[in-house]
């Protein structure tokens, strides 16, 4: 008798939707709270620009290394570590006491958050059937941008109740909770998850690119260069 198909992959999508929301909450709230931050820390507009740039530079510098790390170590371990890391520095943002401390904290925050989107992309590639990836990623991006649009209102509401410092603390907690839940429940491949039925597993792996395929990673580029012919 055929096994009943499970839908464990949709729980993975739920985790990714939650993580997308966390990334936007943690990265976007600082712009909304910048007037209060500038006033309390005595910062100029130029100094706030440097703080924003510190995040962007770290994000760009660490995105490829953390993506490589996720490819080698798997997203269970990597996302657990980087989400806990950047959530800790989201909380630490509320404890900043000067321009220098804020600059360092936001740089380290950006270094952690850099791996979020590559990690999520790899998770989708391992868990979502090719026939569903477009729809799932469309839902994911839409939800993430809705959160981005709501973040200023949420940040202002929370800051109005408890100030900008506690807002960063409150925004950092969901990421810590997410990292713990992710590490306990998730597995890098559906083959490793006890709750996935054979029917669901067959659907997920059908048509999935094999890691040994000629268009996988460096093997593709080596073959491309090997067979390259000069133009005449």
List the predicted regions and their residue ranges:
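Short hydrophobic/alpha-helical segments at membrane-entry points of transmembrane helices
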Residues: 98-106, 232
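Juxtamembrane intracellular "pre-TM" segments in multi-pass secondary transporters
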Residues: 2-5, 189-232
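Helix-breaking motifs and short loop linkers at transmembrane-helix boundaries and internal kinks
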Residues: 42, 74, 95-101, 112, ...
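Helix-loop-helix hairpin linking two adjacent transmembrane segments in secondary transporters
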Residues: 143-193
